[in-house]
Structures are given as structure tokens and as C-alpha cells.
Amino acid sequence: MSYIQGESRQQQSLFPPTLDDFVPADHVCRVIEAFVDKLDMGGLGFQRAEPADTGRPGYDPRDLLKLYLYGYLHQVRSSRRLEAECRRNVEVMWLLGRLSPDYKSIAEFRRMHSEAVTKAGAELVRMARQVGLVRGEWVAIGGSKFRAVSSAGAVGEREAVRRYLDQMNGADEQDEVTIDPSAVAAAIEKLNSDPEPEARFMRMSSGHAPAYNVQTAVDAAYGIIVAHEVTTEATDNRSLLPMAEAAKRALDNPEMLNVVADAGYSNGEQAERCEEQGIVPHAPANRSINNQGDGTLFDRSLFIYDEKTDTFRCPANRMLTRKRVMKHKKTVQYAASAADCSQCPLKPQCTTAERRLLKRHLHDAALQRMNARATAQAMRLRRCTVERPFALLKYVIFGHPRFLLRGLCGAQAEVSLATMAYNLKTMMSVLGVTKLKQELA
């Protein structure tokens, strides 16, 4: 018995197979081609959407976008690896018509078209709406940290330089010390030469590291990412309104949109502005812990607020009146009478100060409404909707949650390509390749 034998490398064929014979009818490449060929590249902002009349011909941006979508769908993000795929991968040969762009052309396309790629992703969301995969009734918002290109040492050194310059500015204003102009000039030059000035230290599962905060808004029907944004904010408490507005725009501005998020998005002012625009936020209020007497004294929740009189009632039925408005903290401070507190038998359980003080957020009513809507069912919907896409983006599409491009613009381009790849995967899993291809045609 012999082994199964392959054909001789010198064997000629009377009817040579075409590239199309190597790509099945239900292959993802055919979906990518149907989607990209339907795009108005010029309208989306892609350069060289129409060939120039003079000069050396360039690559069609459609071909390079197809290449990147294929790469992100197969965990190939590097421009050099994509260049290699063009020469050895039959599927890529079919997709690009045997074109073999060099890695510089591939990398330059991604670097230059961050905004255009984001608009192309919005077109895919619009197509998903047309085929019924986006309902626009409930949207879950979430954020996750992705490592930046810069090392921790580089970002730490940059922060040290900034602190040094701040100290020099303070010393200059006070005229206390003699400042070396050459040292300041060297520090400024080093700061200006930083290749990734936007990266910030953020807390991640592996500790603090230079990172960006990736925000997504996911439709609850089938898990389509309808909006995304890359920010330099280490926390999420200022992202509720911008992400909710972005989701509403992507859904063609419905009259009412339910948005669910975790306690990290707790922001009374933004919740109120959401309600003014027909956006109904559902998120737990992220109140500070009770640190009165190491947690042994009366918590703020035991004090009852009267909206008509704008006062609080303490557990001893005494009144706390408005004292002042702290605009920079967006809070109102209330204080009990020192005379009432001095005679109160509950004072040892209430405060160690002369009198008890309380703070109330200026937009506390909106915060309370948002908190009341954050039911167990709504929080379960949030977990099931927004957590899975991040897992797929980080470990299936990216491979590891670290960017290849420096800067906020580069990170946005990568996330836009990754979310397009994720949405294509989701649409194919729901509709199937054949039906999706027909819908996109």
C-alpha cells in the first residue's frame, strides 16, 4: 500500500482552473466584495476614489479596504503580513485580482483614512438596519481599555517632564528660584517630540499602562455595534451623553431610545440632557461610599430630601437648609443648625463635627430617575449585549488588545475596521453568507 499521492508540480492541465474555482460561493470574500463595491468611496471621503488623469496609476481604495476587512476578519492587522497574504493566499488573490501592493501603500491607506473608514462602518450599520438586524429600541453602552503602542516608560517620562514644566512655571510666577532656560527648552523639545502624546495611563487588568478607552454602543436585538469612539478618558462618567447621541444619529434619530449602561456612566447632568433629547438612560447611581466616621455614622440615604422646601430632614427630624452652591463640583451643600446638633441625642451617631453637612448634586433628580430605571432586567440586558462584542474585538479580531498605530487617529482607524469586521461576522452568523450577499447586492 502506498500513501495518497498529490499531483506533480510540473503537471500541466488542459483546462486550467480559474481563481474563482478556489473560492466557494458562500465564502466571506464574496460578502466583503459585495459590501465594498456598494460604497460611494468618494462620498465617504476616500482619496483617489476616481483615477487621476495623469501620473502613475494608484491602487483603488476599494481594493485596499477589502484587504483590510479580510485581514481583520482573520486576525491579520499588520501591513507587512497583509503584503505577504497578497502573494501566498488564494482567497486574497481572488479578492484583489492578484494585486500585490507593498506594505507601505497598505499602511498609508489605513493611516490616511481614519474618518472615511468610520463613515464606511456607519454605512454597514445602515445596511444592517435595512435588513432588520438593528431595531433601535434598546442600546447598551460600554467601555474597555486597549493598550497603546507607547511603553509605560515613555509615557511615565512624558508625565515627569510635564510635572517639571509645571513646577518651573510655578517657580517663575513666584520668582523664588533661578531657572535654567536651556533645561526648560530641552524639556519642551522632549515633550514635543513625543510620538504618541494622547496616550494616558489607565487601570487595566494587568495593572496601569498607557492605553485608550474604547467606547461602543451596541443594539440589543442582534448585537450590532451601531456607534464607537476612542477616547483618552480614564473613566466613563463623561461618555454617556456623547455615546447616546452617536447611537441615536446612527439609528436615524428615533423619537425615543432606551440606553442602558453600568454605574461608571453615572452622571446626573448628562442624564438630564439625554432626557431632553428623547433618550431614556438606565444606569445605577454611582454614589460615594459612606466615609462618615469610617462608615459608622449615619449615611446620606437616611436624610430625606423635600423638593418643595429644598431642605433635608435628619433622623432626629431636624432640618438641614441650603448653605451654598459649589459650581465647580456641581453640588449644593446643606447644613444643620449648630444649635440643633449640639442638643441632639443622636449626634454621636451622626457627626464628629460641630454640625452635619450634606451634599446634593445639582442634577440629582435626573440621577434618581436614571437609577430607578436600572432594574435587574435592564442590567442583565446590558451584560448580555455589550460585554460579548468587547471579548470578540479584543481576543478574536485583534488577537491581543493592543493597537498597532500610534495616536488617537490611528487607534480610531483600527477600531473602525475591527467593528466593521465584527458587524460583518454578526450579520453572516444571523442571515448566512448567501442571503447576506443577496441583500448587499
What kind of feature is each model-predicted range?
Residues 25-69, 74, 362:
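Basic, short loop/linker segments at the boundary and entry of helix-turn-helix/winged-helix-like folds
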Residues 13, 64-65, 122:
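A generic alpha-helix surface/boundary motif
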